[in-house]
């Protein structure tokens, strides 16, 4: 059976450092570094990934590229007296992934839209870039779409902030079930944060 165009795109993005994507990214990152932290884009950079996550080229759907810093928490040094070990500066791992943070920022920037999903598009030594698919649940073309009409329901408000996207579910430990996951449901906080 003949491969589709999406299959070739997916294959190229599987190992971007070993395919023709490497040269493309090298050029793109030079432009992206000079841009703002949240930029609306005309077309998804990875069309195969976007479509597999629910993207459709229609009104009411927008793709934004979000730049986010790499690394752990960057906390300011305390000026009050305490031992250096108790300053809470080093080895503080955030409970959220950078992808979740990117989704939340995009969602806050476009308050009338909900984050459907997101995917990685590039990184360098200092930053990571994610593209977030945003959907306006009250747009007529979305309301009449049987695959996306559920977003109009008020229970789906603030999806990104409540960890309901794919990246959010992963960060909350919802990808695994059964033995060893007793403290992840109904939520991490309900078990005094012992689930992670």
UniProtKB/Swiss-Prot annotation:
Keyword presence, Ribonucleoprotein: yes
Swiss-Prot/TrEMBL keywords: Ribonucleoprotein, Ribosomal protein
Keyword Nucleotide-binding: no
Biased composition (Basic residues): 186-196
Pfam families the record matches: Ribosomal_L15e
InterPro entries: Rbsml_eL15_core_dom_sf, Ribosomal_eL15, Ribosomal_eL15_arc, Ribosomal_uL23/eL15/eS24_sf
GO aspect biological process, one term: cytoplasmic translation
GO MF entries: RNA binding; structural constituent of ribosome
Family: Belongs to the eukaryotic ribosomal protein eL15 family.
HAMAP family: Ribosomal_eL15
NCBIfam families noted in UniProt: PRK04243.1
Name the record gives this protein: Large ribosomal subunit protein eL15
Protein encoded by which gene: rpl15e
